[in-house]
Amino acid sequence: MAFKVSRTEVWTVMIDDRPGGAADKLEALAKAGANLEVVFARRMPEQPGRGILFAGPIKGKKVVAAAQEAGFAKSDSIHGVKVEGGDKPGLGAKITRALANAGISFRGMSAAAIGTKFVSSIAVDSAEDAAKAVAALKKL
């Protein structure tokens, strides 16, 4: 099964854990014309009242400037890998086994299937792990 596998930049911003906290940040990107492929937000239990928002891609001068003005920063500690292709049963297991066999303990993963298409975003801890993940997943 052939997948398109690529590295992605991960941008993050702290948000208030309240209605509209994420919307405030995402609206700034939308106004600048961002076409985001990944958005993920979660509360931060260790910081009550706060959350973190992950988004990407952030590209183009206008979008980058808007992201920075809204408080986003490109993460140096989170490296992304995107996998996309045709959907088949068991892909999550195959992807996670390929990562395990490559010695990668990923820090986060999301996946979705829409119709016959599949896409997964994987977060790893280093550029080295991202390169290893891309190489391993291209072999699937």
Task: Describe every region a protein language model picked out.
Residues 1-140:
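A conserved regulatory-domain signal marking ACT and ACT-like small-molecule sensing domains
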